[in-house]
């Protein structure tokens, strides 16, 4: 088991991708990419493939799906020389322990079975997630979200909470929607959606894309290289993901009060480009709230009695605590994706009332950053408390370039650089604005990171 733990520690550095071929020659497609771990089904558990992968610095992780005989599969995986096993779905603790006796294990259950308290040592992940992009109605029009702008399907709020609650490396292992052939931009969105939240998306291609890539078709290879350029962008700046979330607004939540739902309160606030720090209820402390001025306490009844003094001290210092009406419960969603259409009128009205309280308190205050002319985009602000370096990620979920974006930050900064995939860095000129300092960005195709100091 000690050896397994040593191997497992190394898996925290895995840049993962699902791989559908067991042909050693297919590994050539991973050359000059950041991918260093491949997830393969049992059909590719051949010693020849594993040996070839090891020769080019790629670890092979075997996938065991729900319903499989995991104990027997673990023995075959060990005999083939696999580095670890990935178990997807629901397995008993007894079965997982038996598999762990053979090889290190990465568990990817549904969200309801995430073990946040046990995640720090080896990482945590799930296969259950929204496919990132603008939500489109049946008629082809963009769906409006609770905030009034285009509804962005995202896992960002969920991933940010999991990072805050567990302190672990997080894998988002959702697959593309079945039966759809997707443009490469949708894969870029999936990679960016996880990366800006501090996680990693397990790269997964639809059958058409995978077929074109393995056949070395020009378009398939070009799309693959473009996707890999974006994955590399986030890996080259991995230190940014370890910066603490910045901003003066905190959201106090736990798994029982909607924190595991995509499209939940963190995502609703994020759609306004208002930076928000997730704080898990069990981690509530003055240290976690340092530097904030506003706290949204989504379910006051869930705060342990011993921690309520922290909230009282926070308010006594002149800070604002926003709480919903007594008895409010965040609507439960079986698939962990908020959908206004599936809410009862009562739940809809209650959620709308809470949202109005939040927006009325926040107003147009600059709680860390304001982003203008960016519909269909999401942002995330990171940086050390007390000023210094700040990094603002910007992700475009639309099918067109975003142009003429303006960013205002409350702190004064002397330098501003815009980092783009492919290694391009643009120097921007800061200027004084009413709320602090601002910069203008001419155009963003898919992803950018604004670094200021």
Description of each model-found segment:
Residues 2, 7-301, 305-319, 324-332, ...:
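Glycan-processing catalytic domains of CAZymes
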Residues 265, 397-414:
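Surface-exposed beta-strand/loop patches in extracellular or lumenal glycoproteins
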């Amino acid at each position: 088991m000690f050896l397994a733990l040593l191997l497992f520690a190394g898996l925290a550095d895995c840049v993962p991708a699902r791989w559908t071929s067991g042909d050693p020659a297919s590994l050539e497609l991973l050359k000059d990419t950041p991918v260093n771990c491949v997830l393969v089904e049992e059909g590719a558990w051949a010693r020849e493939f594993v040996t070839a992968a090891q020769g080019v610095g790629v670890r092979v992780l075997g996938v065991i799906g729900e319903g499989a005989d995991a104990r027997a599969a673990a023995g075959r995986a060990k005999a083939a020389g696999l580095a670890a096993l990935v178990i997807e779905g629901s397995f008993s603790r007894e079965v997982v322990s038996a598999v762990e006796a053979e090889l290190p294990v990465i568990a990817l259950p549904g969200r309801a079975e995430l073990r946040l308290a046990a995640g720090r040592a080896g990482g945590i992940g799930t296969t259950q997630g929204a496919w990132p992009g603008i939500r489109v109605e049946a008629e082809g029009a963009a769906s409006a979200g609770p905030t009034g702008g285009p509804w962005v399907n995202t896992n960002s709020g969920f991933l940010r909470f999991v990072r805050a609650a567990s302190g672990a490396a997080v894998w988002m292992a959702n697959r593309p929607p079945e039966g759809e052939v997707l443009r490469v931009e949708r894969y870029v969105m999936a990679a960016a959606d996880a990366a800006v939240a501090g996680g990693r998306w397990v790269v997964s291609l639809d059958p058409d894309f995978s077929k074109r890539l393995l056949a070395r078709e020009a378009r398939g290879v070009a799309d693959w290289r473009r996707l890999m350029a974006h994955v590399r962008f986030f890996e080259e700046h991995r230190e940014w993901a370890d910066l603490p979330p910045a901003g003066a607004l905190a959201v106090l939540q736990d798994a029982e009060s909607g924190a595991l739902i995509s499209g939940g309160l963190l995502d609703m606030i994020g759609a306004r480009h208002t930076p928000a720090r997730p704080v898990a209820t069990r981690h509530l402390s003055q240290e976690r709230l340092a530097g904030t001025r506003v706290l949204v306490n989504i379910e006051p009844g869930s705060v342990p009695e011993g921690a309520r003094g922290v909230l009282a001290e926070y308010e006594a210092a002149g800070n604002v605590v926003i709480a919903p009406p007594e008895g409010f419960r965040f609507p439960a969603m079986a698939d962990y994706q908020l959908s206004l259409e599936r809410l009862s009128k009562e739940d809809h009205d209650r959620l709308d009332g809470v949202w109005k309280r939040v927006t009325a308190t926040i107003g147009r205050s600059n709680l860390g950053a304001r982003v203008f002319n960016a519909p269909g985009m999401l942002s995330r602000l990171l940086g050390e408390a007390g000023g210094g370096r700040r990094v603002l990620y910007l992700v475009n979920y639309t099918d067109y370039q975003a142009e003429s974006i303006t960013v205002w930050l409350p702190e004064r900064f002397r330098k501003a650089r815009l980092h783009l995939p492919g290694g391009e860095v643009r120097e921007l000129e800061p200027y004084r604005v009413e709320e602090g300092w601002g910069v203008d960005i001419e155009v963003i195709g898919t992803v950018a990171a604004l670094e200021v100091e």
